[in-house]
Structure formats: structure tokens, C-alpha cells
Amino acid sequence: ASSSAEGIYILGSLNVNVVFNTVNLVSTNTNNIGLHLSGGGAIHLLNNNIAVKGGDALYVHSGLSIDQSDFNNFYNANGDVGYWEDEVKTLSDLIAASGKDSNSISEPPYFYNDTSYQSAQVALNNNGSPVSGITTDIEGETRDASNPDIGADEFSPTSQDAGLYALVVPEMPFAAGSLPVK
């Protein structure tokens, strides 16, 4: 059995800016927490990309003062978004419970691999909000001054020049060997 993990844990702290972070917890342990906040106040959560495959992407205890939370991606591949003084199943539930995160999303980040902070998720690109004093990403690359990316990495997604809409021919079941497709 895998042990539980917490990406970011803040306990009893004041005046904390949690901005432009990426957390990717790949274990399916149901006790994992991507971003855990307990006690304290004047906390600002902006432009974070928090993804888990088990547990909660976000866990906020009661009595905590969060001044701002927005432009985040809270994603759980196998369950609820998290907990905000009570279980929140969806991003809409989180917005209703917190009164915050109206510009946040809950999208799979499409990391290049389990140990990568680099994402291929178009929804993260240019959908953050500028934060005064933060002009570069984790790699030292310049952040977009008006519309930075959500998460630790500023990136430009690859453009799609083609995609599969439908497979018309050959019909299933496929015969063995090489077949032309239409």
C-alpha cells in the first residue's frame, strides 16, 4: 500500500501568498492532499495547478481566513475536488462553499510524465492573473505580463494541425495487417 502525501501544507500561518505552484500527486491513496490549509489567515491562493489521483486536491479547515483564491486548477482524477469546511465534489460546489475561485478550473493537467511539472493542458495557458513582483516561472522564463499561465511553468502549447474525428473505413473488427483508413 502506498503512503499518503501532501503537496503543500500550511499550518497556522498569516500573510501567506501561495502563487504559481504546481503539485502532481500520482499515488491513488485516498488520504493524499494537494494543498492543505489549517489555521491562520490573510492567505492568497492564485494561479496554482494542483492535481491528485486520489484524496483531495484542496483541503481547507474551518476557521481559516482566505482573503483570495482564484485562477487555480484543482483537479482530482479519481474523485472529489476537495474539502472547504465540508466535502466539495465539484468546482461549482467549491465556488458555492467558498464564495471564491470564480475564475478557477478543474481540468486534467496532462503532465508529460509523472515527475514533470510541465503541462500540455491548453486551459492552463494564459488563464492566470498577474501577481506583482513575479515575472518569471520556475525555469526563469518570462511570464506573460497580462495573462500568465496557471502553475509553475509558463508554456506555449503545441498547436493541433490535425485530429481524428471519426474512423469510417475500415469497419470493426479490424483484419490483421496494414489497412487504409478514411
What are these regions (language model features)?
Residues 31-33, 39-42:
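Extracellular beta-strand/loop-rich repeat segments of large surface/secreted proteins
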Residues 11-12, 39, 60-63:
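Short, T/G/N/S-enriched strand-turn elements that build extracellular solenoid repeat scaffolds
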Residues 1-7, 27-34, 54-61, 78-86, ...:
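Short glycine/acidic-rich loop motifs that flank beta-strands on beta-rich extracellular proteins
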Residues 157-182:
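Extracellular/luminal regions of secreted and cell-surface proteins that mediate adhesion/ECM remodeling
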Residues 1-2, 7-9, 14-27, 42-53, ...:
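Right-handed parallel beta-helix
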Residues 4, 31, 107, 160-163:
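Cysteine-rich, disulfide-stabilized extracellular repeat modules
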Residues 91-154:
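C-terminal accessory segments
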Residues 29, 54-55, 73-81, 100-101, ...:
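Acidic glycine-/aspartate-rich tracts in secreted/extracellular proteins
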